[in-house]
Amino acid sequence: MLKTDFLGMKMPNPIIVAAGPWNRDGLGLKESLQAGAGAVVTESIVSDTTLDVRPYISCDGKGAQNIRLYSDIQIEGWERELAIAKSGGGIVIASISAQTPSELAYLASKLERFGADAIELSVSNPAAESLEVVASHADTIFEMTKEVV
């Protein structure tokens, strides 16, 4: 098996399971790791989970698209979910999304304390205009990243 050193994280292989509904909670993350993934990424975690889009799948006549915007688990609930995910070993990357650099920094510090091995900044979301705008401006991405690091 091809071992990988990714940003100092020792992984048994280079397969990283991306954020999505299959990684919606600790059990899903743990199952992805048990299936052989080198690392897993949580669904995007936000500080306010009040918006709950349903249905989660949008069909346009040509195909279907997952339109679930982010995790419906409150930030404090991720302490338990990360413990479950990591109970079998493995690397868990927390994906976070926020409107301001300070909110990103808050989420990152919480998830680091909860046991996340790394943080992914989720700044591209075609369903949410404000985040789409963020993703198209390198200077804004720089400022958000600087606040988290």
Outline where the language-model segments fall.
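Active-site entrance/lid segments in N-terminal catalytic domains of soluble metabolic enzymes
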Residues: 3-11, 16-22, 26-149
